[in-house]
């Protein structure tokens, strides 16, 4: 690894750093060496995490080496180097400069904080890639680290805390008891462990990971923890975090401002107080009964391991009185009549709490009493032991009285914190109506009446920052990829930052394209302003803009909306106007859910769709400041484009936003803290710009990445809005007046990037999408969970995920076809169907009634497989992996969906309600009583609108004969259905009914194989080939199949001639089978197109076409629809069903000549014509042998019914080409290439030249027939038919497969 010397410190870096990385590390060292704070912005992809780790650890090693050198010099007392002064050794100069690091224990610890544990895990993985091996510790909560079964099952975090404390105090947790003994083991203390590794190691060694991490913290060189452990004073005390002399690094620091304010704020609702009073009443009643009986409670007897509740009844009663007084004091506040609430200064909180006797003097006793009661009830089961209200009250008291009187007193707190940084806001309880609806006889009076919410909001993140500095932090480093503008960010923190850096990006200008799109394709202005964002004109123009952009952006596309309501409303509008279907036809849509549970499933499905072979990509719809806007991997193909649909300003009328702006304006006007405050309007604009910058940061993730950014709001055209963008983006921004120019430039950008940039390396951790449709089926996201929100339900937003037909979806929409000329690969306005299956669908759509809706709704689960035909490349054969049991993956997916649904239900319901739910499900399974099931589900899910989606998701468990009733129940309870369709009422595992032929007899089994004796029973006089050209040419012996046009996609080309072939086949099928039979055939063919199951379609085909020998040609001609990998099976099945050789089979070799003609063909009258023995060297097919034995003027010797009635049916139109080849090849070219002259490789004798085994061609105006060679001579000589002298061309003559007598 390269070693770089920066500011006198040798940094061991994994690779040669870029210039911007060296600049970044230099600034980090400057902060560390000078003991100052720094704000460092460096975009994701520039390696800032690696730079931070290597620089800080190299600096620590430099300090350690200096101390070691000084100690060595002291021991030898300068004897080794007598001419060198002792002060020049080690860190003596630093000590003289005021940096007294004289021993190893004085070397500062590094505290590395990020927002989530998943981000910390990524940092630890980066640390493993370096050469440094420091002692590492990761701090987490009991919820993440506890492995005790009883504690883990508790749903509430604070219950886990108190139950754990109870077990630790009583020494009843054997995992905790092993900590002191095993914490020094090499396997636990030495390796670099993240949060998951810590849990695994703790489980393996049966030692508590939570307390193990606290022990490791004492000796750790670098400690990883989430933000709130540092910013929240209560958490700092709980984890015993000593900040004196430490270096604190906040990674992803763009969230620090919000976290600082939220950690010092609270909202106390009437429900919190009411639930706390309920618990105190319960404890008071329990302790009163115990005291009256004169016996200790059995749970707290002397032989019990629990310490019990060490409180007098009088103390419990006083605590209840305090809560009642606090509730009364809040209710006594007068509010204006418009329910807008009232705002008080920060100091008012002390007056309010003083009325309830909560002061600096009493807070310790009150907190101790609350803690005892909560711990006393910890671990108890039941719905009436919810101690969340008491725990919240304890947290609130700690926030309000966070400064001890001895450290500054109430006066100083009011002057510094409350008066300047806080506001008290009291407003009516907005959730009262839902609470009142759910209230019952067990609810308290306080919960049933409308109360008031007490809000205590901190508006200065600098308060928490100043507290960290006051704790003695050596250096505070804030770093992120999106801190711009850095100057204003520093003002908000309210502490000095002498070191600032806005690093440029490491990419070149040809790797990024940024455009402001103020207008859509139709010229309408794009705006997310409050008064225009829901207008029909704006939503329609935005939808068209997104659809056109999706055409030119390859692979993954990210679309960010200002908020969830805007995203949901937009999708609802696009669905109603059919715009969503058009977008879905280009790239499947994935929508970011609100809930955390289903988000991982959604993003995994998106990754899998983008990575799927042959995929056209996917679109992910997300929200600014949402889960997808930070921390996720959208590098390379996962995110080639980012579209920002508007400026995500905070809600302007929200009380907290209004008060924040007022607070900033007041502080700026007063010149507080040296005037270092933003104005309210500046802060308001920066909230939107920072969210936009975070979304833009998704597109470029590393040095070789590239992508495009679309800013689709006219306000981005203003200079002040562009000035808020990151410094590395601003030079590339271009404002467009014409939407067509946007598409043109973007298409050119991606063409150049794909040629100049290296292809992304295969992802080792990419979603596991194996080749084939069965693998795609495994990564489908669970349908029920996706329907939990309108925004997540793609069935609602996208009514059809069906493959587009031959006509372009945008054919009738001029605006949406605007960008066709700018696409990378021009696509005609009306594409011809690729393949005969698509041609059949096109033919059926043209035959349907006008206005008939051809597209059907698909579930979200079907999303990943419904688009498969559209994704296949135009060249080359289709790759379809055969699955022996197609039902098994579907069943597995259904099982996975059911499990995920049960997890979601368990998260939403209480333990008692979940037990009721599971019991109802078991009863329904046993009794099939739908009425009882509906009566049970209603109270569980219908009362809370947030649980309506769970009721609708239960649809998957309802039996088919009850699904329609369940749909009615859902509509009655929630106002929305659950996606019922009539076909859902058909049992899925119902055994297939035997198909009857027109005579009423049971059709033969499609898998029937005929013996020789059975084959002899068939009538040999009926020729099989009474239809049109239908056999695929045999594949070329060598070369790439994709290089031969006639073999593209494995089936004959489905251009104009292919459509004629399909239309002719359908016409013949209707004549032969009738309307009912033809409908059955079409239904089976559509099913085959979707599920690729040949057996199903053969069962229907055999029942319809094998009852009468004259229908055999329909069976053989069906081969035009059979996919290449099924051709051989189909030909063998045709032979088995008819007892006759399939016309497309290969000719038998010389060893098989004796088996060419079945014995049944030899008895009867002798057949005229030359025998095979006359041409011993000639190999013939079975059909050829039959034709050779039949002269042109007979139907068959020995036939009792020979006559005109057995002549073939009416002639049909030409095949894919008049010559059996693609247009442009003449007859001579076919013969030279050795291509068969049509479906038959041998035929009758030409009446002109006497050539044998030829297929005749007939004049369209008369019955004149000749072979290919004769026709070519005639047409070259006169271009007229020799018989009728009608002008003819080689394209007009028609192949004749059963020649008429001449």
UniProtKB/Swiss-Prot annotation:
* Upper lineage: Eukaryota, Metazoa, Chordata, Craniata, Vertebrata
Identify the residue span(s) of motif DEAH box. Answer: 251-254
Its subcellular locations are: Nucleus
Compositionally biased intervals (Low complexity): 758-767
InterPro entries cross-referenced by the UniProt entry: ATP-dep_Helicase_C, DinG/Rad3-like, Helic_SF1/SF2_ATP-bd_DinG/Rad3, Helicase-like_DEXD_c2, HHD_RTEL1, P-loop_NTPase, RAD3-like_helicase_DEAD, Rad3/Chl1-like
Look up and give the organism this protein is from: Pongo abelii (Sumatran orangutan)
Q: Which residues form the Helicase ATP-binding domain?
A: 7-297
Q: What does this protein do?
A: A probable ATP-dependent DNA helicase implicated in telomere-length regulation, DNA repair and the maintenance of genomic stability. Acts as an anti-recombinase to counteract toxic recombination and limit crossover during meiosis. Regulates meiotic recombination and crossover homeostasis by physically dissociating strand invasion events and thereby promotes noncrossover repair by meiotic synthesis dependent strand annealing (SDSA) as well as disassembly of D loop recombination intermediates.
PANTHER family, per database record? DNA REPAIR DEAD HELICASE RAD3/XP-D SUBFAMILY MEMBER, REGULATOR OF TELOMERE ELONGATION HELICASE 1
**Stretches with biased composition (Polar residues):** 1178-1187
Which residues lie in Basic and acidic residues bias regions?
770-780
Could you tell me the EC number(s) of this protein? 5.6.2.-
List the protein's name: Regulator of telomere elongation helicase 1
What does the UniProt keyword field contain?
A: 4Fe-4S, ATP-binding, DNA damage, DNA repair, DNA-binding, Helicase, Hydrolase, Iron, Iron-sulfur, Isomerase, Metal-binding, Nucleotide-binding, Nucleus
* Short sequence motif PIP-box: positions: 1180-1187
Q: Subunit structure, briefly?
A: Interacts with TERF1. Interacts (via PIP-box) with PCNA; the interaction is direct and essential for suppressing telomere fragility. Interacts with MMS19; the interaction mediates the association of RTEL1 with the cytosolic iron-sulfur protein assembly (CIA) complex.
Q: Where is this region: Disordered?
A: 758-819, 981-1006, 1019-1058, 1134-1153, 1160-1234
Which Gene3D superfamilies did the record assign?
1.20.1160.20, P-loop containing nucleotide triphosphate hydrolases
Q: What is its main location?
A: nucleus
Annotated SMART domains: DEXDc2 (SM00488), HELICc2 (SM00491)
Q: Where is this motif: Nuclear localization signal?
A: 152-168, 873-879
One Pfam match, by short name?
ARCH_RTEL1
Show which residues constitute the signal peptide.
Answer: none
Q: Which residues bind [4Fe-4S] cluster?
A: 146, 164, 173, 208
Similarity comment text for this entry? Belongs to the helicase family. RAD3/XPD subfamily.
Query: Which GO terms of the molecular function aspect are on file?
Result: 4 iron, 4 sulfur cluster binding; ATP binding; ATP hydrolysis activity; DNA binding; DNA helicase activity; DNA polymerase binding; metal ion binding
